[in-house]
Amino acid sequence: MRATRRRLGLVARNVGIPILSLVLVLVLWQLIVVGFHVASYVAPRPRAAIDAVTQNWSVLWPLVLGTIRETVYGFVVGAALGFFLGVIMAKVSFLQGLVYPVLVLSQAIPIIALAAPLVLILGFSTAPKIVIVAWIVFFPVTVNVIDGLSHVDRDLVNLAKVYGASRWRTFWQIEIPATSTPLFSGLKIGATYAVTGAIIGELAASDGSSLALYQEHANSNLNTAAVYGTTMVMTAIGISWFLLVVGVEVFATPWRRRTVARRWPWRRGRDLADR
């Protein structure tokens, strides 16, 4: 019974803290708009932005699904590419010295500048959006995998060799678990920017209907409430995707659940897993 109450209390704290933060942001928004007499065409009240979303949800929902689809596909492609490229570069030092500068150079290209040639090559379709998201995601994953594999405890690796473990078994049972912390750090960084990449892709390569173009249309019509409401929807997608990655980290690394719980994005203080 006591354990059940502790679990319920843990869930309540993990859910209640972010909800409280959201409420505080909305209250601050309301106070600024009302207190400084901000014109509605500059910044609407939170209720107006929320109403703009709920009243047009039948139109927004298909667009939201499209953005989520682009984010998921691009994230999966970028994460897989980043993981395998990171492993190869960590294992072959010559490739690391050869390819690493190219990777850094690739990230120096502004995403907006990258979008135009992608549209010329792939056309106005979902493909350029997926490529842009993957482009954003793969770099932090690659860098963190290289860093993780470069700092594996060599004593454990040598001990595995002494006991006759194959390279493949050593890789999966020692090196990959040891790399889980930097790997998921890279995935969480990628998750944070994945939705941004999808929105940029929609602005540059949309074939007529997308969440980004819906916001642009609202902006051109001076529908400020819809502009802010769409921004809230985009933010909700990004936060949800980040939390999903955190949840996967918790379940995929059972040996680190206590640490992951302690590093919960908005949690500070005592170890949640011990409460």
Residue positions per predicted region:
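Periplasmic/extracellular loop-to-transmembrane helix junction in inner-membrane transport proteins
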Residues: 4-7, 11, 35-77, 220
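Transmembrane alpha-helices
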Residues: 131-135, 167-200
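Short helix-to-coil transition segments within interhelical loops
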Residues: 149-155, 159-179, 220
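Hydrophobic alpha-helical transmembrane segments of polytopic membrane proteins
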Residues: 211-249
